[in-house]
């Protein structure tokens, strides 16, 4: 981006320019360690430290100005200092203005919910891409035609979002599709974005280390459907009790469900190991469809994507035809085993109680032998879901294999103990704290016809042990284990 004059930037954001020199601003930064000469440094509040405290480091890095809390004390700088009551909201507005309001130049679809966001956004992206250039922001990456960038968060922070959207506009994109997390909504990361289609997939237990309770979690998700963020239709899962509540609170809503009575639902759905087929019933008509996606939860994702793309004006027949060409998302019900293997191995990102339940329920009908579930729970995260996941694995699989996920700074053995507390007496799980060994053991001990589901990490290619991130990919580990299984004959 070329430099922008400070007065123009502040005026675009609705901030007072009086008593401030009109200087060139070369960029925006919220990290004092990465400030470049000429940047406007924005001191965001953190969970432990207020970013305003790092103004000396920002000045040392060449910051041309500071945006800090009106309550910050001891700031005596020779550069313009802009004090605001809400640094987080101001940051989002400054970012939008600096990048020339890119969200206004795209037709946006946003998807929120505990589970299903990634598959649903990829489905929407795939369907829209057939109509016009489309960008995607999500858990795996941010991408648009000719470009892909690895993601650090499900929804990036405000500066990064606006920069990504500006790059999409520059690349000629007409549509943008975004996973919108509850963290992002609570932290105003998507301020400045208004969505022509806003999707709610479901709400189940997760992130209670961040939100005080499920009601707070719901209210954060519901923000996406407020007039501040939504300019078009809401597409809401009516099979979810939180979705029913959400749909009743807003207008311009289409509901989707497995049952007739919703605005969008399937008729005569057939599930096979090769995918799903049936008929879509929608407010604009009916259409036969086939999809290579597997399982009932993927049918829900498909219905959500159909609703979103219909809301954006895409023709139903084009949508139905496009569904057959979407083969899935990396690390989501991803089959790692080959057709010559005598066992099936599936890697999936399921890391919540509901996600694990849906994964195992979707897999069970196609298993000839035993269903073996390798899983763990992340450290420094919601502890209450651990025994729930242990209980679900014991209930829905034939052999739970309890192991580590990302222990982070917690004792891995203590995490396993929390999981094991939910496994009923009489069930004998395999317990192996080392995830590599757990995967190897599960695959080597599986019998012909068994299916091994490795849950929790999906697309991730790392494991966090303490504060160290090491390379670790469930798919690679599974392929190595399969190779050893084949070599022993």
Curated annotation (Swiss-Prot):
<keyword id="KW-0436">Ligase</keyword>
<keyword id="KW-0131">Cell cycle</keyword>
<comment type="function">
    <text>Catalyzes the addition of meso-diaminopimelic acid to the nucleotide precursor UDP-N-acetylmuramoyl-L-alanyl-D-glutamate (UMAG) in the biosynthesis of bacterial cell-wall peptidoglycan.</text>
</comment>
<feature type="binding site">
    <location>
        <position position="181"/>
    </location>
    <ligand>
        <name>UDP-N-acetyl-alpha-D-muramoyl-L-alanyl-D-glutamate</name>
    </ligand>
</feature>
<feature type="binding site">
    <location>
        <position position="187"/>
    </location>
    <ligand>
        <name>UDP-N-acetyl-alpha-D-muramoyl-L-alanyl-D-glutamate</name>
    </ligand>
</feature>
<feature type="short sequence motif" description="Meso-diaminopimelate recognition motif">
    <location>
        <begin position="405"/>
        <end position="408"/>
    </location>
</feature>
<dbReference type="Pfam" id="PF08245">
    <property type="entry name" value="Mur_ligase_M"/>
</dbReference>
<dbReference type="GO" id="GO:0008765">
    <property type="term" value="F:UDP-N-acetylmuramoylalanyl-D-glutamate-2,6-diaminopimelate ligase activity"/>
</dbReference>
<keyword id="KW-0460">Magnesium</keyword>
<keyword id="KW-0573">Peptidoglycan synthesis</keyword>
<feature type="binding site">
    <location>
        <position position="381"/>
    </location>
    <ligand>
        <name>meso-2,6-diaminopimelate</name>
    </ligand>
</feature>
<dbReference type="InterPro" id="IPR035911">
    <property type="entry name" value="MurE/MurF_N"/>
</dbReference>
<dbReference type="InterPro" id="IPR004101">
    <property type="entry name" value="Mur_ligase_C"/>
</dbReference>
<keyword id="KW-0963">Cytoplasm</keyword>
<keyword id="KW-0133">Cell shape</keyword>
<feature type="binding site">
    <location>
        <position position="189"/>
    </location>
    <ligand>
        <name>UDP-N-acetyl-alpha-D-muramoyl-L-alanyl-D-glutamate</name>
    </ligand>
</feature>
<keyword id="KW-0067">ATP-binding</keyword>
<keyword id="KW-0547">Nucleotide-binding</keyword>
<dbReference type="GO" id="GO:0071555">
    <property type="term" value="P:cell wall organization"/>
</dbReference>
<comment type="similarity">
    <text>Belongs to the MurCDEF family. MurE subfamily.</text>
</comment>
<feature type="binding site">
    <location>
        <position position="456"/>
    </location>
    <ligand>
        <name>meso-2,6-diaminopimelate</name>
    </ligand>
</feature>
<dbReference type="InterPro" id="IPR005761">
    <property type="entry name" value="UDP-N-AcMur-Glu-dNH2Pim_ligase"/>
</dbReference>
<feature type="binding site">
    <location>
        <begin position="154"/>
        <end position="155"/>
    </location>
    <ligand>
        <name>UDP-N-acetyl-alpha-D-muramoyl-L-alanyl-D-glutamate</name>
    </ligand>
</feature>
<comment type="pathway">
    <text>Cell wall biogenesis; peptidoglycan biosynthesis.</text>
</comment>
<dbReference type="InterPro" id="IPR000713">
    <property type="entry name" value="Mur_ligase_N"/>
</dbReference>
<dbReference type="InterPro" id="IPR036565">
    <property type="entry name" value="Mur-like_cat_sf"/>
</dbReference>
<feature type="binding site">
    <location>
        <position position="32"/>
    </location>
    <ligand>
        <name>UDP-N-acetyl-alpha-D-muramoyl-L-alanyl-D-glutamate</name>
    </ligand>
</feature>
<dbReference type="GO" id="GO:0008360">
    <property type="term" value="P:regulation of cell shape"/>
</dbReference>
<keyword id="KW-0132">Cell division</keyword>
<feature type="modified residue" description="N6-carboxylysine">
    <location>
        <position position="221"/>
    </location>
</feature>
<dbReference type="InterPro" id="IPR013221">
    <property type="entry name" value="Mur_ligase_cen"/>
</dbReference>
<feature type="binding site">
    <location>
        <position position="460"/>
    </location>
    <ligand>
        <name>meso-2,6-diaminopimelate</name>
    </ligand>
</feature>
<dbReference type="GO" id="GO:0009252">
    <property type="term" value="P:peptidoglycan biosynthetic process"/>
</dbReference>
<protein>
    <recommendedName>
        <fullName>UDP-N-acetylmuramoyl-L-alanyl-D-glutamate--2,6-diaminopimelate ligase</fullName>
        <ecNumber>6.3.2.13</ecNumber>
    </recommendedName>
</protein>
<feature type="binding site">
    <location>
        <begin position="113"/>
        <end position="119"/>
    </location>
    <ligand>
        <name>ATP</name>
    </ligand>
</feature>
<dbReference type="GO" id="GO:0005524">
    <property type="term" value="F:ATP binding"/>
</dbReference>
<feature type="binding site">
    <location>
        <begin position="405"/>
        <end position="408"/>
    </location>
    <ligand>
        <name>meso-2,6-diaminopimelate</name>
    </ligand>
</feature>
<dbReference type="GO" id="GO:0051301">
    <property type="term" value="P:cell division"/>
</dbReference>
<keyword id="KW-0961">Cell wall biogenesis/degradation</keyword>
<dbReference type="GO" id="GO:0000287">
    <property type="term" value="F:magnesium ion binding"/>
</dbReference>
<dbReference type="Pfam" id="PF01225">
    <property type="entry name" value="Mur_ligase"/>
</dbReference>
<dbReference type="InterPro" id="IPR036615">
    <property type="entry name" value="Mur_ligase_C_dom_sf"/>
</dbReference>
């Amino acid at each position: 981006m070329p430099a922008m004059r400070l007065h123009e930037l502040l005026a675009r954001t609705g901030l007072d320019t009086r008593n401030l020199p009109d200087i060139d601003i070369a960029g925006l930064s919220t990290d004092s360690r990465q400030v470049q000469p000429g940047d406007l440094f924005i001191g965001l509040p953190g969970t432990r430290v207020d970013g305003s405290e790092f103004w000396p480091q920002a000045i040392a890095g060449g910051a041309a100005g500071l945006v800090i809390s009106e309550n910050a004390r001891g700031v005596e700088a020779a550069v313009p200092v802009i004090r605001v009551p809400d640094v987080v909201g101001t940051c989002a507005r400054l970012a939008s203005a600096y990048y020339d309001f890119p969200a206004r130049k795209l037709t946006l679809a946003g998807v929120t919910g505990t589970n299903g966001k990634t598959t649903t956004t990829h489905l929407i992206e795939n369907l829209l891409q057939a109509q016009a250039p489309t960008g995607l922001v999500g858990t795996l990456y941010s991408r648009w035609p000719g470009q892909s960038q690895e993601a650090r968060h499900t929804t990036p922070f405000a500066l990064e979002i606006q920069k990504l959207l500006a790059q999409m506009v520059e690349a000629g994109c007409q549509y943008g599709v975004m996973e919108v997390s509850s963290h992002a909504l609570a932290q105003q990361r998507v301020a400045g974005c208004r969505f022509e289609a806003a999707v709610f997939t479901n709400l189940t237990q997760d992130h209670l280390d961040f939100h005080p309770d499920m009601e707070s979690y719901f209210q954060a998700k519901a923000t996406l459907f407020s007039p501040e963020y939504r300019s078009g239709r809401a597409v809401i899962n009516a099979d979810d009790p939180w979705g029913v509540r959400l749909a009743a609170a807003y207008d311009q809503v289409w509901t989707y469900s497995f049952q007739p009575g919703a605005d969008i639902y399937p008729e005569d759905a057939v599930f096979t190991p090769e995918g799903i087929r049936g008929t879509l019933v929608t407010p604009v008509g009916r259409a036969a469809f086939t999809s290579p996606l597997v399982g009932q939860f993927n049918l829900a994702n498909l219905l959500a994507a159909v609703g979103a793309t219909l809301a954006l004006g895409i023709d139903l027949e084009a949508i139905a035809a496009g569904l057959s060409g979407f083969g899935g998302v990396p690390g989501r019900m991803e089959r790692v085993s080959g057709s010559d293997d005598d066992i099936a191995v599936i890697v999936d990102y399921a890391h919540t109680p509901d996600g694990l339940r849906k994964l195992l329920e979707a897999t069970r009908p196609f298993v000839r032998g035993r269903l073996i579930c390798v899983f763990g729970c992340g450290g420094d995260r919601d502890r209450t879901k651990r025994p729930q996941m242990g209980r679900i694995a014991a209930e829905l699989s034939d052999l739970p294999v309890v192991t580590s996920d990302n222990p982070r700074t917690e004792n891995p053995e203590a995490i396993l103990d929390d999981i094991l507390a939910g496994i009923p007496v009489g069930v004998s799980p395999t317990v192996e704290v080392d995830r590599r060994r757990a995967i190897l053991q599960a695959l080597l001990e599986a019998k012909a016809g068994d299916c091994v589901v490795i849950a929790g990490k999906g697309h991730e290619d790392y494991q966090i042990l303490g504060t160290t991130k090491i390379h670790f990919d469930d798919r690679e580990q599974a392929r190595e284990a399969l190779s050893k299984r084949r070599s022993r004959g």
